[in-house]
Amino acid sequence: MTSPMLADERIALFTLGGTIAMAGHTDAGVRRLTGADLVAAVPALGDLQLEVHDTRAVPSPDLTFTQVLDLVEEASRAVEAGATGVVVTQGTDTLEETAFLVDLVWPHEAPFVLTGAMRNPTLAGPDGPANLLAAVRTAAAPTARGLGALVVLNDEIHAARSVRKTHSTSTASFASPNSGPIGHVIEGHVRILVRPSRREPLPVPPRAALAAARVALHTVTLDDHAPYLAEVPRMHQGLVVAGFGVGHVPSALAPALGDLAQRIPVVLASRAGSGSVLRQTYGAVGSETDLQRRGLINGGLLDPYKSRVLLRLLLAFGADRTAVSDVFALHG
């Protein structure tokens, strides 16, 4: 039974496809569930005010920045028309990146909650219905207001800037390694345990400028010499380097990265999966101190994928190296 408080909330539900909406294969391809189908599978949603928008059905690896920002604008219009919260269902492969992109630009107090599923509805024990119910309850909870974009799966509530997909198949694949979840859904009630501070939202860039801003990502590996890095500026306006541990690269790479940093913004992140890039602990060639001295921008706690999202947005605004560095100091 829905509490009177939640029954008064009005939630806009947008569907983007993904595992949560897979309904088996036909000769014509994969059959997709509509938003109405998803809601019908969760009887507890029957008493809530839901506005269902079947935006598009696309595998999450095919989602683009433009599509995500278009969705943000659609969701903004829904909030301006009276929706008190937003829920988006999508595939989980890129969910951590789309959630962070949304969080960077979402200007409203209304919660923007993203969810999905690891087991599709044709399998035993699909997790989509429970995840959708928890996401809607979170979007309808007054305590979730002002928290920006949230990711809700497995009855855990994660801040978009911290969440990672950490397992390829587990229903408990989403985690926030640096901070843990900020809340839980317990016996149907949303419990927010931590309220992370929010940064001022960035404006949505012009689509043409966004299309022209391309960011490469290079993950450093053992005995890496990456001769192609010199060619990166020919087709990209920025580069993210996923370095070892606290932000290190082989010493042989350091001069080339320093040269690149004089031509385009180069952000240094860690490939480790959690923890921060350091600033002034190690001093050898290829260390974080050396690379910053050569002009690389410290990504802080942002992982390589989120660093790429933020850098691309900033480049679409025409940000120079100094501006990029200032924003990463705030977000990282």
Q: Which residue stretches match the model-derived regions?
A:
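ATP/NTP phosphate-donor binding region
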Residues: 1-77, 255, 274, 298
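Accessory alpha-helical/coil subdomains and C-terminal extensions
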Residues: 5-10, 14-21, 34, 40-46, ...
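Short beta-strand segments
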Residues: 14-16, 88-90, 113-116, 148-154, ...
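Short acidic, glycine-rich surface-loop motifs adjacent to enzyme active sites
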Residues: 80-95, 234-245
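Short Gly/Thr/Asp-enriched flexible loops that form oxyanion-binding sites at enzyme active sites
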Residues: 88-110, 249-258
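Internal gly/pro-rich beta-alpha loop/helix module
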Residues: 114-187
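ATP/nucleoside-binding phosphotransfer catalytic cores, i.e., glycine-rich phosphate-binding loops
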Residues: 251-332
